[in-house]
Amino acid sequence: KLSEKYNITIVSCGTTPNLKLKKIWIEDNLPFCRFIGVNFKDKSDKSSVDMNNSIFIDDVARFLDLNNAKYNICFGDIYKWNEEWTGKRCYNWCEVENYIKEIERKGDN
């Protein structure tokens, strides 16, 4: 549903073999998404990807803190790696969609 209105890019960190498998899976299952792989060998986080004027969704708090996105959403349940996140949290994709609609209504996009 979101892909009908927005450009969706999946940014994932990992090692080369892991990123190759993720890319194949995304191409097969989410062909409407663009994939950017960030190799842990070269970078330690996703901050090298320009997310200006974007909504960044991740389940890892440190990745949410280290980017230039206009909006950051911590996705999913509370875990050790995101328990300190105090910003916006969405527990499912319906909540994400509703939050995006809220942003649009406010004209803050």
Task: Say what each PLM segment does.
Residues K1-I26:
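Substrate-recognition element of Asp-dependent hydrolases with the DxDx(T/V) motif
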Residues G37-N67:
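Conserved Lys-Pro-Asp/Glu-containing loop-to-beta segment of HAD-superfamily phosphomonoesterases
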Residues G14-T16, F40-D42, I78-Y79:
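Short beta-alpha junction loops
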Residues E27-V38, C90, E97:
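Structural recognition of alpha->loop->beta junctions
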Residues C13-T15, D28-F32, W85:
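Glycine-rich phosphate-binding "P-loop"
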Residues I55-E95:
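Acidic, Mg2+-coordinating phosphoryl-transfer loop and its flanking beta/alpha structural elements
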Residues Y6, C33, S54, K70-Y71:
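A structural micro-motif
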Residues K46-D50, V96-G107:
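Short amphipathic alpha-helix with an adjacent loop that forms part of the alpha/beta core around
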